[in-house]
Amino acid sequence: MTGQLVQYGRHRQRRSYARISEVLELPNLIEIQTSSYQWFLDEGLREMFQDISPIEDFTGNLSLEFIDYSLGEPKYPVEESKERDVTYSAPLRVKVRLINKETGEVKDQDVFMGDFPIMTDTGTFIINGAERVIVSQLVRSPSVYFSGKVDKNGKKGFTATVIPNRGAWLEYETDAKDVVYVRIDRTRKLPVTVLLRALGFGSDQEIIDLIGENEYLRNTLDKDNTENTDKALLEIYERLRPGEPPTVENAKSLLDSRFFDPKRYDLASVGRYKINKKLHIKNRLFNQRLAETLVDPETGEILAEKGAILDRRTLDKVLPYLENGIGFKKLYPNGGVVEDEVTLQSIKIYAPTDQEGEQTINVIGNAYIEEGVKNITPSDIIASISYFFNLLHGVGDTDDIDHLGNRRLRSVGELLQNQFRIGLSRMERVVRERMSIQDTNTITPQQLINIRPVIASIKEFFGSSQLSQFMDQTNPLAELTHKRRLSALGPGGLTRERAGMEVRDVHYSHYGRMCPIETPEGPNIGLINSLSSFAKVNRFGFIETPYRRVDPETGKVTPRIDYLTADEEDNYVVAQANARLNDDGSFVDDSIVARFRGENTVVPKDRVDYMDVSPKQVVSAATACIPFLENDDSNRALMGANMQRQAVPLMQPESPIVGTGMEYVSAKDSGAAVICRHPGIVERVEAKNIWVRRYEEVDGQKVKGNLDKYSLLKFVRSNQGTCYNQRPIVSVGDEVEKGEILADGPSMEKGELALGRNVMVGFMTWDGYNYEDAIIMSERLVKDDVYTSIHIEEYESEARDTKLGPEEITRDIPNVGEDALRNLDERGIIRVGAEVKDGDLLVGKVTPKGVTELTAEERLLHAIFGEKAREVRDTSLRVPHGGGGIILDVKVFNREDGDELPPGVNQLVRVYIVQKRKISEGDKMAGRHGNKGVISKILPEEDMPYLPDGTPIDIMLNPLGVPSRMNIGQVLELHLGMAARRLGLHVASPVFDGAREEDVWETLEEAGMSRDAKTVLYDGRTGEPFDNRVSVGIMYMIKLAHMVDDKLHARSTGPYSLVTQQPLGGKAQFGGQRFGEMEVWALEAYGAAYTLQEILTVKSDDVVGRVKTYEAIVKGDNVPEPGVPESFKVLIKELQSLGMDVKILSSDEEEIEMRDLEDDEDAKQNEGLSLPNDEESEELVSADAERDVVTKE
């Protein structure tokens, strides 16, 4: 027997074929959301208040300080917030101190700063009753970037950019004449020496002494027309503020505020870290030849001779001294922007590009600026200019912008913080204004602070930001993946149109950080990614991945695990997870396959620094659920990973027989299961609640403590209309641990993810019904509810105040018979449990109609009965097409009962209709290997091919779907599944470490099957065996959320667009089918003139003609001649608006007069035609036309 048994949770054992032992548990998969939000509450908010505190008025007399803050308790719990359509939030209170410096008076006050949305335990937010997820954003890290460029003549040059978190950009570039230019904040370019002069290095000689003599600097100085600091400052001022009269003082303050004011320029801690790392002197000294002797300033000891090569060992020896002051220079710029001294570190080396090797260049570092300095400093600017000149001489490296060392994540906490900062800075402006207006003696903090801008910016972020998304809740895996999604789009990120191939491509630094498989197909490919399974995010927002440390002395793999960012990993040689180890942790083989900076190489074992922790650290959670991933083509694996997220939760879920061992972890962390919070013993289990008696530790003894109640969700509608239902899987008396699963959620079985069902599949054709990936299925799957799913749809009706009076929800509806009202209660609302079909009443509602001129008869009635017969219109809520089912629940909200309703709404009724959908022809199904298809035929069980023992198979797939698509994983899954079913096992075949081909054959033999796993099949119709043996086995098949019931649509008459009078398009608008240009050609080709005329006129936009035709059909008369299509009139109007005089002539040259729609109405009245055109259908048209416009945008 191959493999070993592994326990997953309490209820499931699997035979695992893994050979590599797991040294690291998977982290909590939604930690990226929860820990980031926790950081925001603990530190992010405090940072924000510290940034703007204190706020002083323009005279400096009043000062407002933010001292402390606290979050209260949420108003409603999570479930109630969803029901009531409110935001799940807690009040934020801030302790504020107002100090009057004249009188010395101090006022403290607690100020309410609005309700702040709170993250639920599962990493989501409830905003206005809808569950939303904030997606993490991948952006360029603030830093300094150098890149090479080639101009049109083939001359090589360089560009460099200093990118802050917020503030002005600095860009350096070379031109064809070897002059170095600088751009400040995207303005016109200046010679770079102008900037140096403005910093206080006024003369040519000072600049040459600073940067070092070289031809590029000479060319630049020749181009530079300014001779001293003042002229340079004026030159820069003219570029930044063209048209304003320049003065030296203004120029100084402008430059100072642009770059050296922490309020205007912010690198953030990550930017400071990256710049210090990039501009550090040691990176450029590596392997260079010294042009000066390095001496220890304290002892006078010679550390490195002039002319020595600084290899790794020499550099390591010199490094401690470099940190402590070798080459440190204090410069005192005069008259520049900055008056303080500038500390630099400068060392001379020989230029590697120089042939004679005599030319020296200065390497300048920025001399270790503390992490707290968030703005750029003159030494940063000088060091970055020096780096640029060094690059021209072949010293230093250019950067790869797509490397994950240069891209970082903004998670929930930081995105919220940035939004909160915008709100606070708006508030700060208001506070300053109020300080100067109001009486300083009587003023209180409460009167100064206007919290509106803060609340507005937070609301805007959660409600309409691109990164705040309606949670994909089709199944638990979709939830989990959505929370772990990384997007390069959004504010401050890329746009789909601008993003090129390079950004979207898989990069070697993605290894273990971002999944190379899971990304959408289509315009977002490569811009939206998924976090790898073991990845974490560090405090700077860079993605780290864990590696096992190899001890450099002994060469053994140690238990120590280091998390490395992408640029840290570039310094090490990393072995694969499948490198063979001895029991003591040493490598078996002398040469090891390893990675170094994206190159796969074979290295001697003593050169290995780290080793992968697990084979699945490359891929995301969803991709890790695909068994035999290593045997699939990556394009198909991508489809497989994406389609698992579209699986509809079934009525009877079943976890896969062939799994990967990832099912348990994914289900547990997704938030769909009920997880035990404390160890204890189960006391009572009901359908809706589970009670667990806690175990407390007292003096090392286990003692029974409090009773915890866990509530289960029963038949709740998910965001996507699937059924969200939890079922207990523990029994009374079970002892449970913390973190154990107490109840399965949707698409779960025994604590494991269960997206589909294990069915018996044969690869064979059958009368051509499975042509082009179609699927043939046995009727057994319909009869036994194998693929039956439950769907819940929500409909709502609101009674509003109108100009003519309030709408009313009532049972008394004009022109509706008692039969249609039989399921409504006395309020006019449908009863729970009633079965409804398309068009049935759900909520009876009437709206007052406008007062019209009364006819003589009505006046007579009015005179007799006194009160006018009630003028109301029926605006009841009815079941839309394809929406029939059983009423699951009805919720009524009244303004009188204190429910929060939108303005103008008095009453709101929500009706939930549940449908049980069996699988049918036209539904889409898929396996886990990207093998998708549509059901083309459901055969009676007796017609399906059957095995020698008489068992009919369930599904027939086309064998031609395998070879060209190269997803062989499905065939291996099929064989292993059959063997496992026969042995009564569940198996786990982890990705990249699963069952090999030999393991599959051994398991087949163990199950007593033939080695090729094929079998004779008999035709169910004739009983004859098929000519060839067929591959039959167990495959895990999933029903996807593209069901034919949602797509089927038919229309006879319906709404028309206002302008063209043509039917609207699309199922949502109850639209027609577009008969387009090409379809017209087809009818023209057949010469079907009358059919064509009908389609273009009475079936589309001949307004009068279609009414007459309708009437003729009803009365049984002949259909009249078509008139003029409305769109033709629109075309004429358009030509007339361009100033053309358009006339329509008949065949005998007589002008035909085109009447407008209004004229047609009069004509109709005279002809006595009744158009179905009361206010209601008109209203429908305009509303739908508006929606039409919205969808088109």
From Swiss-Prot:
Q: Name one GO molecular function term.
A: DNA binding
HAMAP family in the record, alphabetically?
RNApol_bact_RpoB (MF_01321)
Source species: Bacillus licheniformis (strain ATCC 14580 / DSM 13 / JCM 2505 / CCUG 7422 / NBRC 12200 / NCIMB 9375 / NCTC 10341 / NRRL NRS-1264 / Gibson 46)
Keywords noted in UniProt:
DNA-directed RNA polymerase, Nucleotidyltransferase, Transcription, Transferase
Q: What class of enzyme is it?
A: transferase
Q: InterPro entries, alphabetically?
A: DNA-dir_RNA_pol_bsu_ext_1_sf, DNA-dir_RNA_pol_bsu_external_1, DNA-dir_RNA_pol_su2, DNA-dir_RNAP_su2_dom, DNA-dir_RNAP_su2_hyb_sf, RNA_pol_bsu_bac, RNA_pol_bsu_CS, RNA_pol_bsu_protrusion
One Pfam family name is RNA_pol_Rpb2_7
Q: What's this protein's name?
A: DNA-directed RNA polymerase subunit beta
Sequence segments annotated as region (Disordered): 1153-1193
Q: Please spell out the taxonomic lineage of the organism that makes this protein.
A: Bacteria, Bacillati, Bacillota, Bacilli, Bacillales
Give its E.C. classification number. 2.7.7.6
Write out the biased-composition intervals (Basic and acidic residues): 1184-1193
User: What is this enzyme's catalytic activity, as reactions?
Assistant: RNA(n) + a ribonucleoside 5'-triphosphate = RNA(n+1) + diphosphate
Q: What family does this chain come from, according to its entry?
A: Belongs to the RNA polymerase beta chain family.
Which ranges are annotated Acidic residues under compositional bias?
Answer: 1153-1162
Name the Gene3D superfamilies on file: 2.40.50.100, 2.40.50.150, 3.90.1100.10, DNA-directed RNA polymerase, beta subunit, external 1 domain, DNA-directed RNA polymerase, subunit 2, domain 6, RNA polymerase alpha subunit dimerisation domain, RNA polymerase Rpb2, domain 2
Looking up PANTHER family in the UniProt record yields: DNA-DIRECTED RNA POLYMERASE I SUBUNIT 2
Q: Name one GO cellular component term.
A: DNA-directed RNA polymerase complex
Q: What does this protein do?
A: DNA-dependent RNA polymerase catalyzes the transcription of DNA into RNA using the four ribonucleoside triphosphates as substrates.
